[in-house]
From Swiss-Prot:
Glycan-bearing residues: N61
Positions bound to Zn(2+): D86, N124, H218, H253
GO cellular component: cell surface; extracellular region
Residues reported in the UniProt entry to bind Fe cation: D53, D86, Y89, H255
Keyword Iron: yes
Extent of the signal sequence: 1-31
Protein name in the entry: Purple acid phosphatase 17
Pfam family of the protein (one): Metallophos
Taxonomic source organism: Arabidopsis thaliana
Localization in the cell: Secreted
Catalytic activity: a phosphate monoester + H2O = an alcohol + phosphate; 2 a phenolic donor + H2O2 = 2 a phenolic radical donor + 2 H2O
Regulation: Inhibited by phosphate and molybdate.
Amino acid sequence: MNSGRRSLMSATASLSLLLCIFTTFVVVSNGELQRFIEPAKSDGSVSFIVIGDWGRRGSFNQSLVAYQMGKIGEKIDLDFVVSTGDNFYDNGLFSEHDPNFEQSFSNIYTAPSLQKQWYSVLGNHDYRGDAEAQLSSVLREIDSRWICLRSFVVDAELVEMFFVDTTPFVKEYYTEADGHSYDWRAVPSRNSYVKALLRDLEVSLKSSKARWKIVVGHHAMRSIGHHGDTKELNEELLPILKENGVDLYMNGHDHCLQHMSDEDSPIQFLTSGAGSKAWRGDINPVTINPKLLKFYYDGQGFMSARFTHSDAEIVFYDVFGEILHKWVTSKQLLHSSV
């Protein structure tokens, strides 16, 4: 009897532990995007790091960037990490058992401060492999930090982040793949997929009561980097962001660090795609008002963000952890400074 009771108590304890783990994630099944909950700290602030275009088994300074991320993560009391896509090069993962997952993620981002949830979107390189593999729960069994979906929401109380699957927007991937094969199993029709995604995003944005609204995608809307602006996003996604009071759009794709403003809205465009290979050396001509370009760095690095009810602070760092650019804005004072 005692043995049976101990077994029952053990099973109950295990179930309680599982429930504690999964309270971090609250799934909303009412037609909106899947939602994850990240409680703010006791002082009400939220801090995170943004990294993109990184997974190269430590090469191209990926390990050095990871080391500096760990130091900054400790300094800002990191809550979670955001990945803007192109998580594994050159062609994503070939399966959920691909050793590249541990070689480029688990074995690289080992600092204590980085042992938090990683919220990731897919990039175009991820779509060149088995895109479904990165979404698999098998990876979370290997490394519990890993959260990757096509599109979803992270609710951090005063900050709400809307992650958008931008690769299916880009029409040239369907017609001019340059010899690459894309995993379109979940995208049988480009137009219907994008239409449904935009509808779900708009519903989520309109229902948001967050002080700060951030949209995260892989592709840039505004960029003077190698790839430049993404026409489809500017035509189809940007109007929804403007209509719903989005404060920031964060992306990767261009292997650089970058900050640009919008011409006719308060939205700031922040590129963090310098997690490993960078230094392309080519810059697209600025076709908009050059005053809208606040910062550009063609090298490795990452970005941190800290939010309170009234203030936001964005900081860009290089591979040595040196501050390259800092931008602070206040919603109370309704002005910003560089």
